[in-house]
């Protein structure tokens, strides 16, 4: 079993969309122009606000109530909400562009070398095939280790660099 885990939800959402929705991600990337610092700043602000809508979510939630018993509908709706949060293609496309067009791929400031986003479509497709049997998680390391620890498990944990400025999530000396 292979598991990819990161505490950064934007990164795990991107990997989830590459794995589960590569064609939708490629399509969305084609519709999101990024040609200037202003475009970069707009995407950066949008990602900070975390305001992304799944246009079909409301319909799917209604259908769950209509076609399933209340107990089953509740479970299905919880799964739909979790999937919508993890599988947000627009958010993934924005994050991908942010890291591709930023200085050192950090996603903080505009300054990457010019490139055509369409050149990355084949990479996304290949990555999707590679991730086919990989479980993608967004957990802290303790929860992940507790869930997947087995006698034959191998873990590589890239530790956070304490007091570094390059992380989207906060780390303390104990985490």
Where does each model-flagged region fall?
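Residue-level preference for short coil/turn positions at secondary-structure junctions
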Residues: 132, 150-151
């Amino acid at each position: 079993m292979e598991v990819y885990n990161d505490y950064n939800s934007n990164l795990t959402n991107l990997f989830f969309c590459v794995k589960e929705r590569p064609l939708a991600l490629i399509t969305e990337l084609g519709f999101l122009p990024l040609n200037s610092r202003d475009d970069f700043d707009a995407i950066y602000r949008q990602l900070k606000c975390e305001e992304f809508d799944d246009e079909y979510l409301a319909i799917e939630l209604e259908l769950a109530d209509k076609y399933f018993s209340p107990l089953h509908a509740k479970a299905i709706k919880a799964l739909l909400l979790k999937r919508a949060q993890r599988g947000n293609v627009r958010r993934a496309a924005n994050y991908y562009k942010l890291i591709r067009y930023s200085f050192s791929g950090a996603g903080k400031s505009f300054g990457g070398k010019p490139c055509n986003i369409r050149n990355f479509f084949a990479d996304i497709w290949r990555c999707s095939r590679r991730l086919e049997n990989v479980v993608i998680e967004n957990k802290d390391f303790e929860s992940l280790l507790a869930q997947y620890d087995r006698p034959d498990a191998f873990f590589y944990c890239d530790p956070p660099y304490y007091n570094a400025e390059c992380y989207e999530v906060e780390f303390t000396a104990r985490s």
